[in-house]
Swiss-Prot record:
Source species, domain of life: Bacteria
Protein name: Ferredoxin-like protein FixX
GO-annotated molecular function: 4 iron, 4 sulfur cluster binding; iron ion binding
SUPFAM superfamilies for this protein: 4Fe-4S ferredoxins
Sorted UniProt keywords: 4Fe-4S, Electron transport, Iron, Iron-sulfur, Metal-binding, Transport
Source organism of the structure: Salmonella typhi
Function: Could be part of an electron transfer system required for anaerobic carnitine reduction. Could be a 3Fe-4S cluster-containing protein.
Length: 95
C-alpha cells in the first residue's frame, strides 16, 4: 500500500531562482477586490495571502509559473504577467 502524496513535500523539492531586479508579475495600483479574493483561493502556490486587515499581500517568489493568476486576473488585478527572464524562475524537480 502506498502512502498519500504530500503536496508541500513535492513542491519543496523545486528550485526557485528569483529575479529580484525584474518581477514577472505586478499587481495593479488599485486592483479589483473581488479579483484578489479569487486569486487568494486559486493560486496553487499560495502566493496571494489575505491579511488580518482584509488587504491581500502578494510575493512573486515561489511562483510556479502556471498562469492561473494571468487567466483569472490579468484585466482586473494584474498590471503585468510574463514568464521570468532566461535562467530565472522555477526549476521543477521530481523526487
Amino acid at each position: 500500500m502506498t502512502s498519500p502524496v504530500n503536496v508541500d513535500v513535492k513542491l519543496g523539492v523545486n528550485k526557485f531562482n528569483v529575479d529580484e531586479d525584474s518581477p514577472h508579475i505586478i499587481l495593479k495600483t488599485d486592483p479589483d477586490k473581488q479579483a484578489l479574493e479569487v486569486l487568494v483561493k486559486a493560486c496553487p502556490a499560495g502566493l496571494y495571502k489575505k491579511q488580518d486587515d482584509g488587504s491581500v499581500r502578494f510575493d512573486y517568489a515561489g511562483c510556479l509559473e502556471c498562469g492561473t493568476c494571468r487567466i483569472l486576473g490579468l484585466d482586473t488585478a494584474l498590471e503585468k504577467w510574463e514568464y521570468p527572464r532566461g535562467t530565472f524562475g522555477v526549476e521543477f524537480r521530481y523526487g
